[in-house]
Amino acid sequence: MVRLLDDPVPFLDHPDAEVRRLAISACVASGLTDESVAGVARLAGEDVDGAVRAMAAEALGGAGQRAVAVLDALRSDDDPRVHEAVATAYGELKHGEAVPWLIEMAAGDGDRASREAAVAALGAIGDGAALPVLLDLVADAPPQVRRRAVVALTVFDDSAVEPALRNAARDRNPSVREAAEMVVGRQPD
């Protein structure tokens, strides 16, 4: 284990998926280098274990623009955990060119975690093209997605945002209400 922490890159090729995930974490914790980014990117695209691919994809969010091409290719992965991780990485990178894909994922009927990650990424990026879908989602989506939309909307300076957040502060779901109340204050019933 000490060897993994000292030099995690060789462990990216370990036969045990758990060790590969630990190596990815150690690469991130020690700061992504060109060598570790190359290894993590390879795992993101080629590993047989979906959890490893997802963890590697999310780690690439800390690799800067050099990771964008890999993340773009991962959009076609069959594992929804990878889609969630790609969305998270795009948000960390504030990658504006991903906004159309993120909008599609946020508004789609995919798994909830991927939709949440896409909404969070749209908020992190702050592109005005996302505003209409975020306004729709804050009013009509699963509760976890509505809650994420509340937070995402806080970065937009648009006259439609405050009424949407005030409505969310009266949402039937307590987690959505709480998130909105933190932004606009408690609303009378």
Regions found by a protein language model. Give the residues of each.
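Structural detector for internal amphipathic alpha-helices that build alpha-solenoid repeat scaffolds
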Residues: M1-R3, P10, E18-T33, R42, ...
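Short, contiguous alpha-helical
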Residues: G39
